[in-house]
Amino acid sequence: MVMSLQAQNTILDSSVHRTTSGSSLQSMIFNNYPPKHEVRAVWLTTIGGIDWPHSYAQSAYSAEKQKQELVEILNRLQKAHINTVLIQTRVRGTMIYPSAYEPWDGCLSGFPGKSPGYDALKFAIEECHKRGMECHAWVVTIPVGKWNALGCKSLRSRFPGLIRKIGPDGYMNPEDNRTADYLAQICSEITRNYDVDGIHLDYIRYPETWNIKVSREKGRQFITRIVEAIHRSVKREKPWVKMSCSPIGKFDDLGRYWSHGWNAYTKVCQDAQGWLKSGLMDELYPMMYFRNEQFFPFAIDWAEQSHGKIVVPGLGIYFLDPKEGKWKIGDITSEMYHLRNIGLGHAFFRNKFLLDNRQGIYDFTSKEFNLYPSLVPAMTWESRRIPVAPSHLKTQQLGGKVVLTWNNTAQYEDGTAVSTPYIYNNVYASRTYPVDTEDARNLISARMMGNQITLDLSGDENPLFFAVTAMDGYGNESRPVQNVAKVEDLLQERQGKAKKLKCSDGRLFLPESAKNADATCFLVESLLGQPLKVLRSSSNYLNISSLSEGVYVLKSLNKKGVSHTFGTFYIRKNKKS
């Protein structure tokens, strides 16, 4: 992997832009400082090729062209620091991969039931992972398409009485036990055969036109039974695979705000908040395609009822298209800031409207809102074990580039083997040492695979120090390995054989040369020569308790403005230097 740091605009001098771990969400928003952990997702719709593909794969050449379309889409999503792609996998009783249960969808080859000559789901997953993005299989559950279309006809033939006709369309009966069993088999097949990061259930509810004859409580039990069956089948295969769904954007009526009769819990029997509480869902993507009082209080309700899980409201950016609605860009950006302020992620519906840059939404996302990469929050409710940190972090200068290499150990700190198939790595860079891996602005590469990265160091504001962490499939991150050798090199280069000064318990002990110097005060600098703090002393030590962990240079200043360098000192947390 080769990455241009300057082009990504990811490196700032964190000695100037540092924020403590205790910073409030409001201060981070005020400073346009994004959080380190945040889901930034997009729905990639394949039905009819409305997001992708835009051409059919009917030959080797056209298949490659179709693949390249997806590559270009993912490249642009990566530049906007999108970290999760929800790709429509089960379309309408049809698939974008070779399934033992259902036929090919026609969006790929142009002919329902015909292979495009490659496995589109496998290709999408691989390309997402190359870019550090999660790839979730979006499974449309209850609707199975037009009554006489291939997917619906196939299911009607195999399961007599299972499919109900409403208007021109067919729907799986949520009250029939076979629906839960069948959908669980499909999701198990996907989870077992693919390195998918999540199973994303769409339309896991009663159709709004369904004549529900049972009580609403009984209806919720029927829908939850389907969710339970799918959850068991997925977690049995791979417990690190995320379970998510896209419920109606308003869970239910609130005390002061009415849902206008369109809500998840009462109208269509989705107990989505209950699924979070019981552990059936790891993530929710509520479809919050609303504005103003129909958005903000309901978003707060989702946040308050998250039960420690991940909530990523979907934003209706399609309304920015004048053919779809009369929304303004400010309607969406205010919602994005609100979601970040209450600790929620954001998901765009849908990909085309983001990449078409409707009213500047792509520019805002990539150049203002998501300035830095982010990590998906860890599934600590599934596992809290911490991987062993990488080791032997080395740098090699090659012209205007630097190559970082390191070693990974597929073990947790408790000595057990890592239970997920991959160890991912996150790479950080900064102009101060040690690199603060809790500062999102220092994250330059997230969730990368492999143990090497090449960085383009063209430009004047390049980092001098690097850190790498390991991360398992649950998202649990290790302690960092720091590029200590680089610090030593810089010390020797800048100070020659400068004396190492002793510090302990917030005190820096002055050398004899300092006691005898005609100094009115002392200056603390960074290794790059940036003045950080002026200190005065009436004894044999200086109070340095206000300085953060790092490496510093101590100088004297006299009345004539003459400066003398005494040496360097390290401050290490919980250690004496």
Give the ranges of each region predicted by the language model:
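Beta-strand-rich modules
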Residues: 457-477
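C-terminal tail/sorting-segment detector
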Residues: 490-495, 509-512, 549-577
